[in-house]
Amino acid sequence: MRRENPRWEYRRETSAYDKSDYRSKFYKGKWEKAWIKNRIQYALDKKIDLYESMWEGYVDKTEHMPKSLFKFFPFNHNSLKCIETNSVFMNNPSNFNDPFDCLLCANENEFLKYCLLDYLKEMDAVGREILSQDELNKLEHSYCGDWEQHNGSIYNTFDSVVTHICYDPELRKERKGSDEISRKLYYDRIKYENGLKELRKNMIQVTSFANIDDFKLTSYMELWAHYAQNHEGFCVEYDLTRPIADSRENAMILGGLLPCEYGAKQIILSKRKIYKYINKIPLTAYEQMELDKSLMLSFITKSSSWKYENEWRLLLPVDICKIYDNMIPFFPIKAIYIGCRMHRDNREYLYCLAKHKDIKVYDMSMHKYNFELEGEYCEADINNYFQSKEEKRQRELR
């Protein structure tokens, strides 16, 4: 990957807010987290859900919004439908190629411990002499975190305490009730795994964009290889400076757009909220907001190995996406960039489509000497292309 040459350009930028305000373009912290926190408090005050609060407060992140966003497509029927209808397809995270993308993480042992404690108390396990009160207390205070961060004894961990409850080392045999406890843990583990899968699948739909410039468009070959069918597809530039015609849809889209964060660790969901959600226990309004926030942060957090994409994501609730059949109206298309390996028939189809919709088209070509695309790309002269093609056909018929 080539290094971008520094650009020396003086522009006096201003902000409507103080630089300590998250709404300012000069804010040094994670503005998106501050914005989400503000939207949560607003939602609690107004007694509305988090997404509605985000849609109402989209203007507070105006200074952070890019002027354009790019999306790479393979050449197929679904991609062409997005161009024809000026919409984007909202995908389910379970369909993503990267298994770590939008993966929901929680402390499994904490969940199992809460389930087991509730069960043992409900079934009067101490009275039935399955375990003593001291053992129940030890289970309640057992450590469930990462072993690397544990400073105490190994015998205080959840797995060790459960083993002690189920097995008598002196008699070298299983204790009374061990089968019952093992069976309970087995089914709760299945419930935990299915619960997280359900939460990931049934809450939020996602579509992705790249916030890039001309340099990255022509030099970041991974984007073309991964998402544009090995350069046989195309890239669409959307103009965010021109609002969507429907003001409600405009607010919904701008409110749902957020930049991705990159790091080495995933977001860990709250143990109590996950416990209540999986066991169908009603959450308080605040707990639901916090769970929604954690889900949202999980869906915009990716491995640092993907940082070059500079990705933005549109997040919308599943029930909203169903209303639109997952095809959400988006900002006007500013330009289409055609991959350097696109087949001629496909290229001509895009030419016709772009001409009909009055969209600029650029043909990308390989650089002669570098591992990149030509940076000096020109707008395709569609009328001249088809005129020349017709003249050639007429000559061949003579």
Report the location of each language-model feature:
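Partner-binding and oligomerization surfaces adjacent to conserved cores of proteins
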Residues: R2-R398
